[in-house]
């Protein structure tokens, strides 16, 4: 995410009503996205959702069947890929095995027939940017996976494009290296200030570095927002389930109490929970509507004692711990409620004084969350 280190460069990108089919398969279905100048923007979704196809259309490697792609208001469809203001970093590095790090990075500049002095200046600048200044004479087969990807990033940036397109660039790396390189990539973005468009299926990658995210599925953009908006206020059931873990239920609105502009309490009947719950909702849901309700596992509190009633805004359900899972900084509990529904609860470890008594397998527990911690996702019918 941008921290204001560099002046904003890059360009605004406008994608309007873009569609693309391969035979009978609809890869993109009327997709519209606006990306701001200098933004770190992620296209996030499962395999086959259309995110890479959209990136390839922006890059100029594919042509859409319909729609417009514009850089700073100028339609770039019909302009060759090498004439656009963008460069692409691929998952497989695409390095020349017979060339050194220096020559791989310098290659685009040699095609432009720049002077040796200018080439050397830029190569040194960008090898320093990606922390490879001590490896310039090595061949790709002498580099680690992370170092190879740094070479690919430097080569893509050395032409000084307005837009850097990244097609799952870290997916071939191990988890720790992927995490470290992601931090470096975010730092590079902050330093150079151009527009980054990052394709990934990994929600944690997108949430940790993006200014905004477009969540895609089956060729459509389901939601665009900041990481906080996407996680805390998912627009659809798919987004809620794809981004993190959640408890998701079908519900019926049974009552609404609107006592002020910032006080709109809704009562939901949820058969899977065997009763009703309270939720704060600002969209003025109406009684009788069928909706989806979600509460994140980390929002649910788990205790051995029944929590004291706090007005009518605390939702409490009793159950038995069916499967406790310790995962370091937190424990995950799968609680079988009295009516048979399985509820996920994540408890982050603070310290032994704050954690309270240890909760174990087969313990009877109480799961609770406040009305402000749940969320009505979408109205299924009016």
Whereabouts are the PLM-identified features?
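ABC ATPase nucleotide-binding domains
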Residues: 40, 79-241
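The feature captures the beta-strand-to-loop junction immediately N-terminal to the Walker
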Residues: 44-46
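ABC ATPase nucleotide-binding domain helices that frame the ATP-binding cleft
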Residues: 52-55, 151
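Helix-to-loop junction immediately C-terminal to a conserved catalytic motif
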Residues: 59
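Conserved ABC transporter NBD signature motif
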Residues: 67-75
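Non-catalytic connector elements of ABC transporters
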Residues: 246, 256-382
């Amino acid at each position: 995410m941008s921290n204001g280190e560099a002046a904003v460069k890059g360009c605004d990108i406008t994608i309007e009503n873009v569609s693309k089919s391969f035979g009978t398969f609809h890869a993109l279905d009327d997709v519209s996205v606006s990306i701001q100048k200098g933004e770190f923007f992620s296209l996030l979704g499962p395999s086959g959702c259309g995110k890479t196809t959209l990136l390839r259309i922006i890059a100029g490697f594919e042509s859409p069947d319909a729609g417009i792609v514009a850089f700073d208001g100028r339609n770039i469809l019909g302009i060759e890929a090498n004439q656009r203001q963008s460069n692409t970093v691929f998952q497989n590095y695409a390095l020349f095995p017979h060339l050194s790090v220096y020559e791989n990075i310098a290659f685009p500049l040699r095609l432009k027939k720049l002077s040796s002095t200018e080439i050397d200046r830029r190569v040194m600048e960008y090898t320093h940017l990606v922390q490879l200044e001590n490896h310039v004479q090595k061949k790709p087969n002498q580099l680690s996976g992370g170092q190879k990807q740094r070479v690919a990033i430097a080569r893509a940036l050395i032409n000084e494009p307005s837009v850097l397109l990244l097609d799952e660039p870290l997916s071939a790396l191990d988890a720790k290296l992927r995490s470290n390189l992601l931090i470096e990539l975010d730092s590079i973005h902050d330093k150079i200030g151009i527009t980054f468009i990052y394709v990934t299926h990994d929600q944690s990658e997108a949430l940790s570095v993006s200014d905004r995210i477009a969540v895609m599925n089956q060729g459509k953009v389901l939601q665009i927002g900041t990481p906080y908006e996407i996680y805390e206020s998912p627009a659809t059931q798919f987004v809620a389930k794809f981004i993190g873990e959640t408890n998701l239920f079908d519900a019926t609105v049974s009552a609404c109490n609107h006592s002020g502009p910032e006080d709109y309490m809704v009562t939901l009947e949820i058969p899977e929970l065997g009763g009703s719950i309270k939720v704060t909702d600002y969209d003025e849901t109406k009684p009788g509507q069928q909706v989806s309700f979600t509460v994140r596992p980390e929002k649910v509190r788990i205790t051995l004692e029944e929590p004291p009633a706090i007005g009518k805004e605390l939702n409490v359900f009793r159950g038995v711990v069916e499967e406790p899972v310790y995962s370091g900084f937190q424990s995950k509990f799968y609680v079988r409620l009295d009516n048979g529904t399985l509820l996920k609860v994540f408890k982050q470890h603070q310290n032994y004084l704050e954690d309270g008594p240890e909760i174990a397998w087969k313990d009877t527990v109480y799961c609770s969350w406040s009305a402000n911690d749940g969320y009505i996702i979408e109205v299924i019918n009016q």
